[in-house]
Amino acid sequence: MSGRGFTVKKNWDNPREHAMPEGVRVPAEMRIGPVSITPATVLAPMAGVTDTVFRRFIRHASLFSSDQLSVVSDQEKASEIDAEVTNSQSGCGLLMTEFTSADGLSRMRESKRKRYLTFYDDEHPIAAQIFGSNPETLAEAARIVQDTGFDLIDLNLGCPAKRVVGCNGGSGLLRDLPKIGEIFRAVRKAVTIPFTVKFRLGWNDAQIICVELARMAEAEGLNAVALHARTREQGYTGQARWEWIAAVKQAVGIPVVGNGDIRTPEDAAAMIAQTGCDAVMIGRAAPSNPWIFRQIAQYTATGSYERPTAEDRHRLIRTYFQMLLDEAEASQSLPKDARMGETAGKMKQFASWFTHGVPGGAKLRASIYQARTGAEVLAQVDGFFSALDSGDSSAETEEEAIYRESALVCD
């Protein structure tokens, strides 16, 4: 699979049979400046994925389980969901936006900015991630983010995409530490909210600069760093090298967030044990398993965790799709026909992820891909799970699973 796809064996429905590292827990809290991240788990920024609908979906994912039905019923009667209760149920402590161009933010009209910077009260704490290469432009974008009400601002130094690197953004800047220093100083001077950075090991194995970069971030007044433990040259291939997360943690006094190859609660515990990092960041596993944050919280507390039933998956798929439709109806950022078309497209995109482990999932995906509207997609989902309840289904083949897994979007 080329481009943004990748293939990975997923283990969350059949977790590895080993005990959690003795005495190790994903921390109950991490503080980034004055902001409390409770628990210390972070949803990674992912292009085309972590919009406001997906972020709220992740924050409330535990409410889509059959054992939470009474909670859902009670919450639906309220005008809004209590953020503290929801955090403890979902296990996701910090949400992050899709990465957004600083050049775009500084130039676009206020009405268009809302398309990229929209968030709701139940998303706090939330960070906005920006990318670019001009210190003054990034500083102006950071001011816009702060004025919009975000809790944190994050700088992307990790994206390996050619179109971003070609503009000297994302991981392209890893070859220019002096420029990064200028950016750190400009953004830090521009805002008072916590300022963080996400970066990779370096451009390639011959240019690993993550420890030096982390020390620079601390010296310039940044409040935390997040490391995806691969080089830009690696992209999303090979194993994440967690030993470098440990090296960064030993080198700085500010919080360190570890990222890379966390697919199960066991992985999260192992990363904490091996690196001593202050929090874990989860990207590509979240679209396929929105329960992963809750499972990490359960595993930390008890050493075991629940796996979703088919009924849970039905509720999850239907709820997310309905959230997409509701947001499209409410949004004014595009003409209605365009909004609805975009929504139907996103439903099809996510269908291959959410149906992991569902008997006959390929049949549901095929029917969703043929649907022309969001309403038709919802009808196909309901019809499929109704038939599944009656026993009319066929198991997903290994070939189908490989195709679905290769379609995931990289973070």
How would you label these PLM feature ranges?
Residues 80, 84, 136-169, 177-254:
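Alpha/beta enzyme core
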Residues 37-40, 103-127, 159, 163-167, ...:
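N-terminal small/glycine-rich loop or linker at the start of catalytic domains
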Residues 2-33, 37-42, 47, 69-70, ...:
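Alpha/beta catalytic cores of nucleotide-metabolism and tRNA/nucleoside-modifying enzymes
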Residues 21-22, 26-31, 46-67, 74-144:
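Glycine-rich, positively charged N-terminal anion/phosphate-binding segment
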Residues 46-48, 100-102, 131-133, 158-160, ...:
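Active-site beta-loop-alpha junctions enriched in small/polar residues
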Residues 59-63, 144-147, 272-274, 297:
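Short, solvent-exposed amphipathic alpha-helical segments in soluble enzyme
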